[in-house]
A protein has these predicted regions:
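N-terminal export signals
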Residues: 2, 7-28
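Flavin (FAD/FMN)-binding glycine-rich loop and adjacent Rossmann-like elements that form
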Residues: 97, 101, 120, 133, ...
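Beta1/beta-strand and adjacent pyrophosphate-binding region of the FAD-binding site
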Residues: 36-47
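Aromatic pocket-lining residues of Rossmann-like dinucleotide-binding sites
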Residues: 57
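Conserved N-terminal/central alpha/beta ligand/cofactor-binding core
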Residues: 11, 62-63, 69-169, 173, ...
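N-terminal Rossmann-fold NAD(P) dinucleotide-binding loop
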Residues: 50
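A short, basic/flexible loop-to-alpha-helix module at the beginning of a structural domain
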Residues: 25-37
Length: 484
């Protein structure tokens, strides 16, 4: 049996053990021999959180390797076509509070015509799908421009990026994260690292390293997935006029939203032409001429930690896209000749694992504006939970009772495994609290904080758990993060 075959069987067996148990079985196997790559900081996942973690760590002096299973950085923003960036302002709408790397990315996109600055984008308009709550000062952007910019920023910072490379399992030294086993076009590879950042969204590294995790709400329920798609060749003036003429009919009943084009959806349902879980169609105007983003499909029962479930979701997402395109062509003024530009190359996922950390973001703290002393970001994003207990049509949207709330650094420090940091929607948080900060601007701020923390820990010769949080907060402030 050749070496690659032995490695494949070994990897498959270990992964099976991890899937059946708590994740520690696979990770507990020590690695011997020289690593294929050696780095200070390994970031697993190149999405919004991961790319910001990588850039921040590198700018603060660390050698950084990013492992990304696709062929691009940006994750949901580029692969998933998720947009716009949700609000980065406080509740009053007066102050931009998610800044730092996020603001730099926005400003560089604006300078090349790839985004609209959020200061000039308001709720109740076409760039926010006419949704007022939580949609003031969103950031429309062009995902193609973002792909190129993120490549440039990683190159400028000296970040090494491995595309088309899948994370297989952690490498642990006892209960210390020490790297990862990977699989790419050249077969299995191993990377040694001093600190690891889990930016997988699903907490894959943490789970397989044995860190306690909760899937969804802990009772088998997860928020539904959505397939985003972009369309063009729209007569935007006619579309906008139709919405404006009917906007007074927007309402919510029994947790179900009746917003854009619900007056046509009712007709399509009666004609047997609409079998989707939502009773409206949410469209966001894009950056290009007469380009629109559709965020409307709901795919219930998707467990994105399971490949079979995720595969079914991709197929269902494209089927739902076809239903909506037919609907647009037949019913919506200005969309008679709409052209489908693209669907997401991956379905949009709102929720999977919540990883246990040294602190837990609690929904009551979010709603009441609690700001821990070691807060590494401030946000005002509302608690946005899609899908009810037994009804994917409903949603729960709760605005906060303060101008902002904070996320503790300890929510990014994984419990029980040293030198492992979390960034993005897999942070340590109650499911409803994570429903507030799962959107991209807070995830990018978490990434900047995690990457900065990793670099500072290495400089100080301490673990991330032992890092003086006041030093981290001071460094983030100096690097243009807004922390009050």
């Amino acid at each position: 049996m050749d070496a690659n075959r032995r490695e494949f069987l070994k990897g498959a067996g270990l992964l099976a053990a991890a899937a059946c148990g708590g994740g520690a079985t696979a990770a507990a196997v020590p690695e011997t021999g020289a690593a294929d790559y050696a780095t200070d900081v390994l970031v697993v996942g190149g999405g919004p959180a991961g790319v910001c973690a990588a850039i921040a760590a590198a700018r603060n002096g660390a050698r950084v390797l990013v492992v990304e299973q696709s062929g691009m950085l940006g994750g949901m923003a580029t692969q998933g076509l998720v947009g716009p960036f949700m609000t980065c302002y406080d509740k009053s709408g007066e102050t931009m509070i998610i800044r730092g790397l996020f603001e730099e990315i926005v400003e560089r996109l604006v300078a090349r015509g790839g985004a609209l600055h959020p200061r000039g984008v308001f709720g109740n308009g076409p760039y926010s799908a006419w949704i007022p709550k939580g949609h003031d000062h969103v950031t429309p952007f062009d995902p193609e421009a973002l792909k190129v910019l993120l490549d440039e920023m990683c190159a400028e910072a000296g970040v090494k990026v491995l595309f088309h490379t899948t994370f297989v399992e952690p490498v642990l030294d006892g209960w210390r994260a020490a790297g990862a086993r990977l699989f790419g076009k050249g077969g299995f590879r191993r990377v040694s690292a001093k600190i690891v950042g889990d930016a997988t969204g699903d907490g894959d590294y943490a789970y397989r390293a044995g860190v306690p995790c909760t899937l969804g709400d802990g009772n088998g329920r997860l928020m539904p997935a959505t397939m985003f798609f972009h369309i063009c060749n729209i007569d935007s003036d006619r579309l906008i006029a139709d919405i404006e003429a009917n906007r007074h009919t927007f309402h919510k009943k029994d947790g179900v939203s009746y917003r854009g084009f619900h007056w046509y959806v009712t007709k399509a349902i009666a004609a047997g032409e609409w079998d989707l879980p939502r009773r409206c169609l949410n469209m966001y105007r894009g950056v290009g001429p007469d380009v629109w983003l559709v965020n409307n499909g709901r795919i219930p029962g998707v467990d994105a930690t399971d490949s079979e479930s995720l595969s079914r979701a991709e197929v269902e997402g494209r089927r739902q896209t076809k239903v909506m395109m037919d609907f647009l062509h037949k019913y919506v003024p200005g969309c008679e000749h709409a052209v489908l530009m693209s669907t997401g190359s991956t379905v949009g996922i709102r929720e999977t694992r919540h990883v246990a950390g040294e602190a837990t973001l609690r929904v009551e703290d979010v709603l009441n504006g609690v700001v821990p002393a070691d807060s590494i970001l401030l946000a005002a994003n509302s608690v946005d939970v899609h899908g009810g207990k037994d009804n994917p049509m409903v949603s729960s949207y709760r605005t906060i009772n303060a101008n902002w709330y904070g996320v503790s650094y300890r929510c990014l420090v994984a419990k029980g495994v040293e030198n492992l940091l979390l960034a993005g929607r897999c942070l340590s948080g109650e499911p409803a609290a994570a429903g507030a900060v799962r959107v991209m601007p807070p995830c990018m701020a978490m990434g900047q904080a995690a990457g900065t923390a990793a670099a500072l820990a290495l400089q100080g010769g301490v673990t991330p758990r032992a890092l003086d949080a006041s030093k981290l907060v001071a460094t983030l402030r100096a690097q243009k993060a807004f922390l009050g």
